[in-house]
């Protein structure tokens, strides 16, 4: 049997906007698409092969005279790395999901791995050149991303669908019932924590077009084109040809394919069999047709079978007596079948099990017969490993292929009866992927699927982040890679607080500004560089008075200066607050930068106050005003408008470092407030963050800033190796609660236990942060947790300016 039509697949513009008036050129283009769809006037046998009657815009498909179906697309969740309890919960919920469908609903699970959208993945990692001095770096970074993309299978777009079909007398009757089922399906997915959405008619047609055009090709279609052209939806999705005459193969366009079915022979199955088949890095389509048997009918059938087996047993016993041997000796198969039938009856009657009929189909497609046979052999090997057999559908290739498109129609009568829990073992969840487009940044490869991890922290409810890891685990490198990526593809400002002078090379290469704060006040070039902790701008707070928030900062600063267990007393705080308001009054009346107060002005104002506490606070400040640590008693003389600013505070020493970090944090807040007015994001990276959390007051201020950053367009990232110190702070829970992004690299044994409890990490996930190499770990993005690995190419200019390994820094 051979069905063939020779016409080119429709190609043209993407889905137009019907309300807009079409231009002459667009009308011409649409006319050409319709002309191509009409073909050469021969019988459209390829269209006739596709087994449905009509697709409606709302996503309902009329499959046969009385059968209607709808499709829901769903995403993956982390099943393989889940805690044992979570795995059990997912499995039980999936069993409940299957039990929801009664005998009147046919269910089809479809898993489509296709390489048709590799261009979209490459587009996501393409960094276009710009008119600046960084195109050589852009090219290098773009090439690195393309190489990483090639390592994974992001070119294989993995999609999951569930299609449910019912029989109804009319479209109206089908519509209301399908809507109820759709709502219940979405709610069931919600219970599983799975993101799902119903598909429109256009989306279902686009999906079918992708299946029938595995070599690619743009889908161009609009429902408004059907009436004037006299065409059906099939004309826009059918391939150039189908051939089914070879018995064991089919040909579709330029591709050759084969459909096989899974013979389930094993007494027990592993929950990885489906995921192993889907992990094959080849174009594969897997479909499970599941049909529930009416519970009463199933129980009656099994009881009849038990009765038949008992009759056979009695006959065997009579035969034994006549022959003169022990009547208890009966054929072993008979005893086994009887025992299994009774167990099955018990499952159905008392263990919340149902009976299902399952058809498991696997479609492989390739460019050549040899490649196809290799792909089929690989899939058959997985079946064999699980004591099953993958058997070719000889002379049923057409029915097999058409049963493998998500329409809800099963044309293959080969079915295996299974209980709910046996059916649920084909669990459709493996690992989540994180591949966003737009301004998404690269973080590494998914260690489970080898797919690229691209995500945009701005899409999170709370983009604040943490980078945690032991020395040598790749923390600083990961931060630098994120900075570079953000610098190249966004217009965000990037500010770094650098306590160890590790970022100079990268900042210099990106023409950023390094502000070196030291007790002498001398910068890298030997010229004075000062930052004024009293700096303020009129946008400093979202209310009318920016002074309240600034006063809070100065209280934190004074608390750090005074030190001691008790810190500032209520009277001290009152005195400081009064002095702050007095000092800023002239500047706020006339905001001239030359009138910006400095620490010395606060010192003098405190001396004017009558309370003895004021004199005590002033005495504590004296060291920082007129003493040897007076580096912060000057007006800011450095330009802070560069996109990339690094505050190098290594030379401040122990006495000034915490103070320096706090002052830098305040400078960043100033920048964030200015940028918000310009609708610009500010990324702030804080290395050795645990130092800020050691003092209660600086910790409280840091947490306050952490909370406030989000709605002001700030994206703070804390980097630390010292998790114990980080978690010793009472404020740290607020940091974790307000951070939807965590990059966790290798962890020490004690820290692992603490983090596992804090972030609810499973033992399987903890393996990825236990004795791992640099660049390996876990990424937490909202509710998504993925194991990642990043192997940045060492033979690049970027690697040389980003590495912090002493031997490599020397070479650079």
For every predicted segment, state its role.
Residues 1-429:
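Extended, folded cores of ATP/NTP-driven motor/assembly subunits in large transport
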Residues 77, 84-103, 110, 114, ...:
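P-loop NTPase motor domains
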Residues 478:
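Hydrophobic positions on the alpha1 helix immediately C-terminal to the Walker A/P-loop
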Residues 759-812:
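Conserved P-loop NTPase
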Residues 475:
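Conserved lysine of the Walker
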Residues 467:
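Hydrophobic anchor at the beta1->P-loop junction of P-loop NTPases
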Residues 516-521, 741-750:
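Conserved AAA+ ATPase "SRH/arginine-finger" region at the nucleotide-binding site
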Residues 485-495:
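Post-Walker A helix-loop "phosphate-sensing" segment adjacent to the P-loop in P-loop NTPases
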